[in-house]
């Protein structure tokens, strides 16, 4: 990811990024498992990358937005939020699950050095590890704590994870790759613009 070390974001730029991420999460979270895959995992990863440090409070606000969207969707269907099968004791483990995604993005931003190839390698590693931890927390907490699972066993949990893991990973990779592409395009445009300004200034 070229330009990470020298990329300094203004408060306005960070606010714009936060707004875009919040809208993407809200817009896709409404459609859980529908035609548009939920981007929540990727949103927290990308937010950790761009908003770590002085904007870390954005994590709590994104969590609040996620809960609000769930509340609106469930009650909009005429159902009781607290009695919905998704809102089991495992629901609150999403704090830790999404925290893993945020931490993955923050780690990438903090420790990336070297070439673009090395950056992409670290991106792949951070995303794989954080998404896997996120999945184990969210899937495991639901399997072991939700009343939806009648008979629990370790073998059953492993089988259940096998059914869902790659789908969630694929969705996260898809959205993060899209964000990476946008990052590279914008970085290139900014460098081109900066170079044009310098050339114009010399004239």
Predicted features by range, described:
Residues 40-44, 93-101, 175-179:
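Hydrophobic core segments of transmembrane alpha-helices in multi-pass, intramembrane catalytic enzymes
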Residues 27-28, 46-54, 100-113, 181-190:
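Structural signal for the C-terminal ends of transmembrane alpha-helices
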Residues 1-6:
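Short, Lys/Arg-enriched N-terminal segments with co-localized hydrophobic residues
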Residues 29-37, 64-101:
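Interfacial aromatic-anchored transmembrane helix boundaries in multi-pass membrane proteins
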């Amino acid at each position: 990811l070229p330009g990470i070390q020298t990329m300094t974001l203004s408060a306005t730029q960070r606010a714009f990024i936060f707004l875009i991420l919040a809208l993407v999460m809200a817009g896709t979270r409404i459609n859980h498992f529908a035609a548009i895959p939920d981007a929540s995992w990727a949103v927290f990863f990308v937010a950790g990358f761009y908003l770590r440090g002085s904007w870390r409070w954005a994590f709590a606000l994104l969590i609040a937005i996620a809960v609000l969207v769930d509340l609106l969707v469930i009650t909009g269907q005429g159902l009781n939020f607290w009695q919905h099968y998704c809102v089991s004791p495992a629901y609150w483990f999403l704090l830790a699950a999404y925290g893993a995604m945020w931490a993955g993005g923050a780690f990438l931003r903090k420790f990336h050095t070297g070439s673009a190839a090395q950056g992409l390698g670290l991106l792949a590693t951070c995303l794989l590890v954080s998404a896997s931890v996120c999945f184990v927390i969210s899937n495991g907490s639901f399997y072991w704590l939700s009343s939806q699972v009648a008979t629990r066993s370790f073998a059953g949990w492993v089988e259940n994870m096998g059914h869902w893991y790659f789908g969630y990973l694929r969705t996260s990779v898809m959205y993060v790759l899209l964000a990476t592409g946008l990052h590279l395009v914008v970085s290139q445009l900014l460098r081109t613009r900066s170079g044009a300004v310098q050339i114009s200034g010399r004239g």
